[in-house]
Amino acid sequence: MRVIQNEQMQIGEVDISQIKFDPRSRDDIPKILKGLQYIYVNLDLREKIFELLEREIAPQIDKRNGRPGMELWKILVCGVLRLDLNEDYDRLCELVNHHNTIREMLGHGTFNEETYHFQTLKDNVGLFTPELLDKINQIVVQAGHG
């Protein structure tokens, strides 16, 4: 059973649409996060992408039964970062546990000390394939042209 995203914000959590980025940054992480922020604030686009994720990520598993697993939004954020940055799971684990802006994008507030374990990332983010990213890219491009 997977939840798209927890709708109840926690104390200290920043709404994803309100995350601020340094406009002078030349690093690639803020650019990726801005793209994810665009997906988040565009409701029609977000719904199409989550429909795709629900179909593609472990389709044989009963979505109404069992433990919740990692939220689809977190799989999307981590999967896009891993594939776009061409990083291994060790670096991804370091980024999602210690990079403040990435943690905000994952829905963690200032007081949330939840961390991600290597194996959890590997098991869940590993379901996010380059082919799935390509399908998402096609949906985003269509939304940009429409």
Located regions from the model:
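Helix-turn-helix DNA-binding elements, focusing on the entry/boundary residues of the two helices
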Residues: 89
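Basic, short loop/linker segments at the boundary and entry of helix-turn-helix/winged-helix-like folds
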Residues: 34, 38-77
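Alpha-helical support elements that line or immediately flank enzyme active sites
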Residues: 76-86
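Charged, often Cys/His-bearing segments associated with DNA-binding zinc-finger transcription factors
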Residues: 1-48
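Active-site- or DNA-interface-adjacent structural scaffold in DNA-acting proteins
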Residues: 108, 112-146
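Catalytic micro-motifs at enzyme active sites that drive phosphoryl/nucleotidyl and oxygen chemistry
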Residues: 64-67, 106-112
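DNA-recognition alpha helix
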Residues: 92-105
